[in-house]
Amino acid sequence: MLPAFSSCLKGVFIFCLLHFCSLNSFAQKDPDYISSFNDRPHLTFELASRKQDVVIRNPDAENIQLTYRPNSRSNFIACIDYRWLSLSLGLIKFQSSDGDRKGETKQFSFRASFNGRRFWNSNFIQIFNGYYLSNPQVANPSFNPQSDFYPYRPDLTTTTFFSNVFYCFNPDKFSYRASLYQLDRQERSAGSVIAGVSLRMHRMLSDTGKTLIPNELESQFKPEYRLISQSASNFSFNVGYVHTFVYKHSWFLTLYFVPGISIQNSYYLSEDKQIRNLQNKATAVSEFRFILGYNGDNWYSGISSYSISFAGKRDLGVWVDDNYSWFRMFVGYRFKAVDRTNLPDWRKKIQL
């Protein structure tokens, strides 16, 4: 394990403390704006497409840019939501039809969220094994994308962990839980400024120790820029705005934009076998999400798109941008409310 991951454990400790904010953050709501389905267990099924682009730039020649991405078509996901707890697990991966030319990618994903009205916290881990170079024309101008085989790295694995805590400034009229987890329903259009902190821990490893720079371009990159593996952590401060537009009671559109400043610590292993430590570098981060859906009394469904980007910088030496995007279609059902009169004491204490 590269050193950056062990140094990030202190950040995980901070977030473990913040998780408990959500257990005691059920602010009062205005019933004209928010209806709650808090005591009804939710079961949701998703068909999701996830991408994670690793963009490698040459600090000495910005026109040289290599983009590696997983060849993952879609993933079938099951989600359980009840009161403040939300869990999801990727169950089935559907193979891509072009796997013979771009290679196959294995993937795993798991999410755990703690959802109050004023505070919410989300934690997510995803793993991809197997990447292909999506723009091989940079190294081979004669490449034919219709018939040629893409350069494929079955040895390349990325592991990414996200965690965030956000605060809602208008919890009595706006519910983030309504659009994302359908634990509530937004009855009237409303929005809120939100602010929070987030943590990303990212590791990219190559089992073979081979550089990600194609042979044709090695002369364009200094040895210290010929990336083999990377470990990075980002602690970000975010402020933005989210708004839900309601149409005819049950139809909704949610737009979410949250930019921020990120403090990045990175370790890079290059072809010269030196590990370089780049600490406390300020970079930009931005998040965008839209959700369009239907939220009825029992059934709900919709589509959503989410993207987050961590921009690299020239002065970091090895210039790497990490771009994440998710698209999902979902449908879910609410079961009858749980009788809480005979719950064990431990569940009453944690309000679950």
Regions found by a protein language model. Give the residues of each.
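Short loop/turn motifs that connect adjacent beta-strands in outer-membrane beta-barrel proteins
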Residues: 28-39, 170-191, 206, 247-253, ...
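Outer-envelope beta-barrel architecture signal
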Residues: 37-43, 74, 83-85, 108, ...
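Hydrophobic, lipid-facing positions within transmembrane beta-strands of outer-membrane proteins
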Residues: 41, 74-78, 106-110, 119, ...
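Membrane-embedded beta-strand positions of outer-membrane beta-barrel proteins
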Residues: 43-47, 78, 87-89, 112, ...
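Transmembrane beta-strands of outer-membrane beta-barrel pores
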Residues: 47-53, 82-86, 91-97, 116-118, ...
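Surface-exposed strand-loop-strand hairpins of Gram-negative outer-membrane beta-barrel proteins
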Residues: 51-75, 86-103
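Extracellular/periplasm-exposed beta-strand and loop segments of Gram-negative cell-envelope proteins
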Residues: 67, 134-138, 147-161, 204-216, ...
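Outer-membrane beta-barrel "beta-signal"
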Residues: 162-165, 323-352
